[in-house]
C-alpha cells in the first residue's frame, strides 16, 4: 500500500474565490477558456493514474486519501518566511529613509583582481584557484551615530546599534587581511528622525550637512580586537602611555564628514581608539554604502543573502613573490605589477618543432570556433496577400481581433515556456514565481486571467502584463498607482454597496480587459450613495427657485384659442394657465375599485386614499416615488395609526414596493419612525386604536388556579362550577355583602329621619 503525500492547498478565502469564479464562468453551460478544460483533464488523469489499494476497504481508503489531498492544510499565522514580495500596502503614505550599509574592511594598498585572469598575448598562464584559509569569526557590536550641524556644533540626531559577526580572512597569495560582516542588516533611518531646525530659512527639515560615525565594539568575545587589523601593543607603548585602555575596551571607528560630498559608495579610513580621548589611524579602509531609498527598495535589498567570502576575488600583494603551480610556471600574470609587463618565460623547443606553452598545437585556440560577432537577425517576410492588404489599409485581421476579444496577448492562447510561471519587473530587481502566484499576498491561481482579476484587489499598484516568448514567458511590470483618489483614502468614505444576483455568465477575459458589464448589471439603484454619518452633516441653505418666465402666445399662421373659453388668443399675450382638474380621474379609480367584489372594505378604503394622493403628483419615473412615499406617510400618519386595518394595508404596500426594488431600505426606516411618533402622540392624547382589544380585565383573585388536593370541598366546587370561589374570595365576598347591607341600613335610617 503506497503512502499518500499531502499537498499544501490554498487558503480558505482564496479557494472559495476561485471556486466562485469558475462557477460564474460556467453559467449557462459556457466554459470560460480552454485552460480550464486542460486543468480539468489534468486532474482527471491524475485521478485515474492513482494506484488502487488492496483489501476489502480499498475504496474507502482511496476516498479518504483523496479527501486528505483536497483538504488544504492550515497556514501558520506566525512565520518568518514570506511567499510574496515585501511591498508596502501604504506605499504613498510612507516617507523615504536614509540607508547605511557597512560592507567590508580592506587594506588601503590591496589590489583587487578577479579569478581566472590570464596574461596577455596568449601566454596561457591561468590564475591559481583561491584557497581561503585562517578564517576568524569574532562577535562584535556595530554602533551608528548620525550628527547634524548647527552654529558650528555637532548635534546627535540618531543612535542605533546591532550585533554582528566579523569574519577576518586572507587569501593564499599572502595579501593583507580582509574583513566581512555577517548577520548584520543595513541601518534604515526615516528622514523625519533626522530633521533639524535650519538656520537660514527657519524650516524644520533636512540639514545641509550630516556626519556619520560607525564604531565597532566588543560583544563579550575573548578574541577582541582582531589581531589582523590591530597590531599588538609593545611594552614601550604600554610604559609611556599610562592612560591605555584594556584591549577588550578598544573601539574601531570610521567617520564620514559629509554624506553629500561624494558618491554613495564611500571608503573611510579606519581608526582605533586605545585611549579614552584620542585615537590613531590604521592602514585599513571601511567601505560603506550610503543612499536615500524608499521603503520598498530597502526591504527588497534586505532580502538578499548575507555576503560571504567570495572565491572570485583574488588579492595579490605586489611585494610578495607569485606562487608557483605544480609544473613550475607562475600561478598568475596580470599584465605585470603596477603596469610593468614581466618577461615571457623561456620555452623549450621540442623535437617536432612545437612550443610547449601549456597548450597543445593540435588544440584550437580559445575563441577560434566561435564567431566574432552575433548572427544577423533576418526579418521574416510575409507573403500573405490578404494580410498585406489589411496592413496597407489599416484594417485589423480577424485572428487578431478574436485574440484581442478573448484576452489578446495576455489571454490563455500563449503557452508559457515554464508551466504557470511568471516574472515580475520591480524597480530594484526581478522576482520569478510559479503557479501564477500573487506578488503581494502569495496566493496561487489556476490561470493567468484569474491572476489579473486577483490583482484588482490590490489597487495600490498598477500591473502591466506583457508576453515575451523569447524571454521565456509572461512579464509583469509593477508600479505605484497614479490614482490620487485611492491614495488619499477616498475609498474609505462610507458608501452603500448594493449587489444583486448575476444575470449572465462571467467572461473573465473580457472582465480583466475592462468590460465591467457583468458587474454593473448586478448593482442595485442605491449602489454608490454616500452615507452621511450622524452629527457630521453640514446644514444646507434653502435654495431659491428661479422665477419661471411667463409663456407667451406664439405667432403662427393658424389662430389659437383658449381651451375653456374658446376665445382667440393674440400673439404676444401671456398664455393663460388653468389649474388641472383631476377629480374625474379620481372618481374613475374609485368606481373601478368599488367594482371589485374580492376586496374587503378596509382594502378599498386604503387604496382610494393612496390613489387620491399619488395620482395628483403625476409621477413620471420610479426615482421620484421614495420622496412622495415619505410625504404620504408624513401627511397621513395620524390617519394610518387610527385603525389597525390601515396599518396592515400599509405594510402590504411597503412589501410590494420592496419586492419590486423601487423603495430603498432607508425610506422604510424613516417612515416607520414617523408612524411610531404618531402612535406616541395618539397615546398621549388618550386615544385608542380601533381594532385593538381593550385589554384583559384585571382579576380580583390573585391565585385563581388550584390543585385538586388543595381544594377544601371538591364536591361543592364541582357543583358550583365557574361560580366556585376560594376561601379568601369567599371571605372578601362576605365582607363586601356586609358593607352593602350596612350602607343600605344607613340610607334607610336617613330617609326615615327626613320624613
UniProtKB/Swiss-Prot annotation:
Sequence ranges of Basic and acidic residues compositional bias: 411-420
Q: Which superkingdom does the taxonomy of this entry point to?
A: Eukaryota
- Region feature Disordered, mapped onto this chain: 26-79, 333-377, 392-420
- List the C2H2-type ZnF regions, as residue ranges: 436-458
Q: Name one Pfam family in it.
A: VEFS-Box
Assembly, in brief, is: Component of the polycomb repressive complex 2 (PRC2) that consists of four core subunits icluding EZH2, EED, SUZ12, and RBBP4, among which EZH2 is the catalytic subunit and which minimally requires EED and SUZ12 for catalysis.
Annotated family: Belongs to the VEFS (VRN2-EMF2-FIS2-SU(Z)12) family.
Q: What is this protein called?
A: Polycomb protein SUZ12
Q: Write down the species.
A: Chaetomium thermophilum (strain DSM 1495 / CBS 144.50 / IMI 039719) (Thermochaetoides thermophila)
Amino acid at each position: 500500500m503506497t503512502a499518500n503525500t499531502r499537498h499544501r492547498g490554498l487558503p480558505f478565502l482564496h479557494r472559495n474565490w476561485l471556486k466562485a469564479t469558475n462557477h460564474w464562468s460556467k453559467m449557462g453551460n459556457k466554459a470560460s477558456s480552454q485552460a480550464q478544460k486542460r486543468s480539468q483533464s489534468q486532474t482527471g488523469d491524475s485521478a485515474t493514474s492513482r494506484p488502487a489499494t488492496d483489501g476489502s476497504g480499498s475504496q474507502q481508503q482511496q476516498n479518504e486519501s483523496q479527501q486528505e489531498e483536497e483538504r488544504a492544510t492550515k497556514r501558520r499565522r506566525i512565520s518568518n518566511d514570506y511567499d510574496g514580495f515585501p511591498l508596502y500596502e501604504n506605499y504613498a503614505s510612507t516617507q523615504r529613509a536614509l540607508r547605511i550599509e557597512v560592507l567590508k574592511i580592506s587594506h588601503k594598498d590591496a589590489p583587487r583582481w578577479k579569478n581566472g585572469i590570464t596574461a596577455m598575448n596568449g601566454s596561457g598562464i591561468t590564475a591559481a584557484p583561491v584557497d581561503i584559509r585562517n578564517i576568524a569569526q569574532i562577535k562584535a557590536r556595530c554602533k551608528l551615530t548620525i550628527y547634524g550641524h548647527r552654529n558650528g556644533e555637532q548635534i546627535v540626531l540618531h543612535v542605533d546599534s546591532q550585533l554582528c559577526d566579523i569574519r577576518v580572512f586572507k587569501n593564499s597569495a599572502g595579501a593583507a587581511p580582509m574583513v566581512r560582516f555577517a548577520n548584520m542588516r543595513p541601518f534604515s533611518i526615516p528622514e523625519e528622525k533626522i530633521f533639524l531646525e535650519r538656520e537660514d530659512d527657519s524650516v524644520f527639515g533636512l540639514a545641509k550637512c550630516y556626519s556619520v560615525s560607525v564604531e565597532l565594539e566588543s560583544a563579550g568575545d575573548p578574541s577582541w580586537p582582531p589581531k589582523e587589523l590591530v597590531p599588538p601593543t609593545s611594552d614601550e607603548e604600554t610604559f609611556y602611555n599610562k592612560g591605555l585602555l584594556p584591549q577588550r575596551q578598544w573601539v574601531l571607528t570610521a567617520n564620514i564628514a559629509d554624506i553629500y560630498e561624494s558618491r554613495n559608495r564611500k571608503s573611510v579610513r579606519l581608526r582605533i581608539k586605545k585611549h579614552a580621548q584620542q585615537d590613531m589611524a590604521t592602514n585599513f579602509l571601511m567601505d560603506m554604502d550610503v543612499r536615500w531609498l524608499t521603503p520598498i527598495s530597502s526591504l527588497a535589498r534586505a532580502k538578499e543573502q548575507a555576503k560571504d567570502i567570495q572565491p572570485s576575488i583574488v588579492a595579490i600583494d605586489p611585494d610578495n613573490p607569485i606562487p608557483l603551480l605544480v609544473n613550475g610556471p607562475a600561478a598568475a600574470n596580470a599584465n605585470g605589477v603596477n603596469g610593468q609587463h614581466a618577461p615571457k618565460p623561456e620555452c623549450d623547443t621540442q623535437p617536432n618543432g612545437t612550443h610547449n606553452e601549456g597548450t597543445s598545437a593540435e588544440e584550437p585556440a580559445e575563441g577560434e570556433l566561435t564567431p566574432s560577432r552575433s548572427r544577423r537577425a533576418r526579418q521574416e517576410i510575409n507573403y500573405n496577400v490578404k494580410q498585406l492588404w489589411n496592413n496597407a489599409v489599416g484594417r485589423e485581421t480577424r485572428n487578431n481581433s478574436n485574440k484581442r476579444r478573448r484576452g489578446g496577448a495576455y489571454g490563455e492562447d500563449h503557452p508559457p515556456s515554464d508551466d504557470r510561471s511568471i516574472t515580475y519587473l520591480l524597480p530594484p530587481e526581478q522576482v520569478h514565481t510559479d503557479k501564477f502566484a500573487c506578488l503581494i499576498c502569495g496566493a496561487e491561481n489556476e490561470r493567468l486571467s484569474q491572476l489579473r482579476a486577483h490583482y484588482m484587489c490590490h489597487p495600490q499598484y498598477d500591473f502591466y502584463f506583457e508576453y515575451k516568448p523569447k524571454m521565456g514567458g509572461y512579464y509583469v511590470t509593477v508600479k505605484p498607482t497614479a490614482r490620487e483618489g485611492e491614495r488619499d483614502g477616498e475609498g474609505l468614505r462610507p458608501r452603500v454597496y448594493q449587489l444583486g444576483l448575476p444575470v449572465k455568465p462571467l467572461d473573465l477575459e473580457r472582465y480583466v480587459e475592462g468590460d465591467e458589464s457583468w458587474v454593473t448589471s448586478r448593482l442595485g439603484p442605491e449602489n454608490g450613495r454616500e452615507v452621511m454619518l450622524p452629527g457630521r452633516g453640514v446644514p444646507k441653505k434653502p435654495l431659491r427657485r428661479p422665477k419661471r418666465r411667463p409663456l407667451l402666445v406664439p405667432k403662427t399662421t393658424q389662430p389659437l384659442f383658449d381651451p375653456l373659453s374658446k376665445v382667440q388668443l393674440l400673439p404676444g399675450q401671456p398664455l393663460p394657465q388653468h389649474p388641472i382638474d383631476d377629480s374625474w380621474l379620481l372618481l374613475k379609480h374609485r368606481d373601478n375599485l368599488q367594482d371589485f367584489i374580492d376586496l374587503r372594505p378596509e382594502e378599498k378604503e386604503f387604496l382610494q386614499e393612496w390613489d387620491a394622493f399619488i395620482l395628483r403628483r403625476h409621477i413620471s419615473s420610479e426615482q421620484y416615488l421614495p420622496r412622495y412615499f415619505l410625504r404620504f406617510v408624513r401627511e397621513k400618519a395620524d390617519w394610518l395609526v387610527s385603525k389597525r386595518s390601515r396599518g396592515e394595508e400599509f405594510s402590504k404596500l411597503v412589501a410590494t414596493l420592496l419586492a419590486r426594488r423601487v423603495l430603498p431600505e432607508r425610506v422604510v426606516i424613516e417612515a416607520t419612525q414617523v408612524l411610531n411618533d404618531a402612535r406616541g402622540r395618539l397615546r398621549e392624547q388618550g386615544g385608542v386604536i380601533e381594532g385593538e382589544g381593550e385589554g384583559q380585565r384585571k382579576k380580583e383573585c390573585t391565585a385563581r388556579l388550584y390543585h385538586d388536593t388543595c381544594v377544601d370541598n371538591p364536591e361543592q366546587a364541582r357543583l358550583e362550577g365557574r361560580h366556585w370561589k376560594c376561601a379568601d374570595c369567599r371571605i372578601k365576598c362576605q365582607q363586601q355583602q356586609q358593607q352593602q347591607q350596612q350602607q343600605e341600613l344607613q340610607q334607610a335610617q336617613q330617609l326615615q329621619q327626613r320624613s
